[in-house]
């Protein structure tokens, strides 16, 4: 599933082609995504694009009349293409832009979403989200305070969007490894020092992935059609049985909250 770095990479890639131009119209080949494509998107006509933002794993395209909210789901990606580029089997939504380009949404598994919102303050999907992990609001003190008396395992706890947004399966595993913290410890066992280290590590891992264009394990592509190169730097995720890059101990895996977790039993405590 595309996580925060992949969504931010997509945002940065499409923004220069959208802002200052207009969406002439939308082409929807298959409206049966996770939720049906909103009727307001189907009816778009000559709508100026004011900004392209991100909140958690949602892309927010601001128009003069409202907002398009895009979620990439499990396998979605966005590309900027020449308007005449022929569509493929899994290309479900196009936004035709006034500069001769098309924003194309590809999603083999169709778990993504294209929604409309008149006002973000009233959006149900954006309500109750925690702070952005790269913001000043996400601090060691915040994480430590939230962890008090929590028996939930650290790994699934970090993936709760009410705690902090955008730290998905890949980056939770990678951050815990880099911070030297076992994923199956209770969240309440974090010390103040560990909370500070973990927050700094999460920020560093996410920023590094954004620099590398995100992580491509299967379907994700950047807006220019290239894969995300952070996959080449993964320390533990998807490496069960392979030697730890730091100590040589075989990487282990476990199921936490029905999600696969990867860790080094020697480097993490």
Swiss-Prot record:
Q: What is the free-text note on the cofactor?
A: Binds 1 zinc ion per subunit.
**Which one GO biological process term can you cite for this protein?**
base-excision repair
Q: Where does DNA bind?
A: 90, 109, 150
Q: Which cofactor does it need?
A: Zn(2+)
Named from the GO MF annotations, one term is: zinc ion binding
Q: What is its EC number?
A: 3.2.2.23, 4.2.99.18
Q: Where is the active site?
A: 2 (schiff-base intermediate with dna), 3 (proton donor), 57 (proton donor), 259 (proton donor)
Question: Which key words tag this protein in UniProt?
Answer: DNA damage, DNA repair, DNA-binding, Glycosidase, Hydrolase, Lyase, Metal-binding, Multifunctional enzyme, Zinc, Zinc-finger
| Annotated HAMAP family | Fapy_DNA_glycosyl
Q: Assembly state and interactors?
A: Monomer.
Which family does the UniProt entry place this protein in?
Belongs to the FPG family.
Which protein, by its recorded name, is this?
A: Formamidopyrimidine-DNA glycosylase
Recorded source organism is Serratia proteamaculans (strain 568)
Give the organism's phylogenetic lineage.
Answer: Bacteria, Pseudomonadati, Pseudomonadota, Gammaproteobacteria, Enterobacterales
Q: Which gene encodes it?
A: mutM
